[in-house]
Structures are given as structure tokens and as C-alpha cells.
Amino acid sequence: MALRRILRIDNPDDKKILTTRCHPVRLPNPALKQLVADMFETMHAASGVGLAAPQIGITQRLAVISIPPVVEERPDGSKVEVAPEQNFVLINPEIIKASDQEDVGLEGCLSLPGWYGEVPRAAWVTVEYTDLNGRRQRIRRATGLLGRALQHEIDHLDGILFTERIRDLSTLKDYSEEMAPTAAE
């Protein structure tokens, strides 16, 4: 596995790649497993939830998503995992159905680190894709973080940046200093 450089929206050369509609992945592809491993490693190192291939300079319709486990605290203070981590490898994904209802939520992007804005998204989506084993899969009516991540990563594959979805640009703010660890941490 290898860390890849994440392209940035504020770099003109990178932005050309980030705003390009990606080509379908041709299968079988022997190099794909290594690329996917690199993408997961890069995404986790950057504390991300999703990463699309164009974010590392590859204009193919490929994305990875990692939804963290859901942990609840019990009355005695102990913690219990109520939903496991979910990892997805999305090859040639497409949204086949989307809710007419919108959900506005705070969203960021590894290609614009530290910046977040309120982005309207469909309240749920159904997505079809091919998995790493070459099988067609379907995620039905994905909501919450998974639904938002699917829409965000598929936008990347279509050359659309999350900043283009923001209706009120005054909600786009740099939180990097607020999120930086203090000397005591």
C-alpha cells in the first residue's frame, strides 16, 4: 500500500483534473486491488470518509467509502458498538433513484481541507455499482452519512465539486484552526 497525494481545489492544475468527468473502469483490471488499497490508506490517513479516484489524479469512475462504526454509551459509562464499520468499493457507480426531498448538511472535502459548507443533497439515494469481485451491487435508499458520501463521491466522478452544490456561499467556512489540536491535546 502507498499513500497518494490528494489533489486540491485551490491548485489550478489539480482543479482541471477534479472538474473532469471520469471514464468508466474497464474490468477485469489486475491493478485495481492495489489502487483500492492505496485509496483506503490515503483516505484514512487524511481522516476522510470517502475518496474518489480523481482526487488522486486518476480520471476513472472509482471511489471508496468508509462509514465509521456507531458506538453508543451505556448508562454505566461503557461503550458498545451498535453498528459495524462499513467499507465500500464503488466501481462505475450510478445513482439510479433519488428522493425528491432534500436534506441540507455540513459537508467537507479532502480536496479542500478544513473547509465546510451547508450542502443540499437528496434525503436518500439508491446506487448501483460493481464491487471489487466484479459483481453488480445495489445500495437501496441510503440515508444519513452513507447517502451523503455516495452523492459527494459520485459528484467527484462527474467532475462536480461540493462547493458547486452550496446555495449560500456564506456557509462555506474554514474550520481548520478551530479543529486544530491545542497545545494541551
Curated annotation (Swiss-Prot):
User: Quick one: which residues bind Fe cation?
Assistant: C109, H152, H156
Known cofactor(s): Fe(2+)
Q: Which UniProt keywords apply?
A: Hydrolase, Iron, Metal-binding, Protein biosynthesis
For this UniProt entry, the molecular function terms from Gene Ontology, in alphabetical order, are: metal ion binding; peptide deformylase activity
Enzyme category, top tier: hydrolase
Q: Does the keyword section mention Manganese?
A: no
InterPro entries, per the entry: Peptide_deformylase (IPR023635), Peptide_deformylase_sf (IPR036821)
* Reactions the enzyme catalyzes: N-terminal N-formyl-L-methionyl-[peptide] + H2O = N-terminal L-methionyl-[peptide] + formate
Q: What Pfam families does this protein's entry cite? A: Pep_deformylase
Q: Which GO terms describe its biological process?
A: co-translational protein modification; translation
Keyword match Transcription: no
Active site residues according to the UniProt entry: E153
Residues spanning the membrane: none
Cofactor note from UniProt? Answer: Binds 1 Fe(2+) ion.
Q: In which domain of life is the source organism classified?
A: Bacteria
* EC number(s) recorded for this UniProt protein: 3.5.1.88
User: What this chain does, per the record?
Assistant: Removes the formyl group from the N-terminal Met of newly synthesized proteins. Requires at least a dipeptide for an efficient rate of reaction. N-terminal L-methionine is a prerequisite for activity but the enzyme has broad specificity at other positions.
The family this protein is said to belong to: Belongs to the polypeptide deformylase family.
What name goes with this protein?
A: Peptide deformylase
Which species expresses this protein natively? Roseiflexus sp. (strain RS-1)
